[in-house]
Amino acid sequence: MFLDIDGVLNSNFWCENNQREISNGILIDKDKVKLLSTLVKTTSAKIILHSGWRFWFDSNLKSLRIEAEKLVDIFQREGLSIDGVTPDLTTEEIRLTKKFSLVKADEILLWISEHKDVQNWIVIDDLDLHNSEIEQHQIKTDNTIGLTVEDLENAKKMLLRK
């Protein structure tokens, strides 16, 4: 499971209630993490971060920032762990324009090509990733509400199909 964080485990709606910014790395909606935990436990999926949050971990998945430590702590409370991260294919131009969605699909497909044992996979992200193959595997969340029970059910079907 390729997991984005902002717009999935937090949302504009949730943050407006708390009058805080979602991208400051502090706000994770624990109810969304519980939904994610249900998905992982019922499908045995592994979590591969493909979010900008992946840059807050070293190559051994050790936290480099307090925000990453908080994410790991919240995950651990729900029995979750981060099992990997996608490679970084961003260019300087993409960094400057902040159009990271333009390379996310390539990063995911590269990760899959390097891990031949992957059977079923999904992408949970609030952004359009500009790739038809990814689109067939994507649970596209509404960034104003984040991960929902309906998203969870659709993800479960995708991961458990033969």
Locate predicted features.
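Catalytic phosphate/metal-binding cores of nucleic-acid and nucleotide-processing enzymes, i.e., regions
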Residues: 1-162
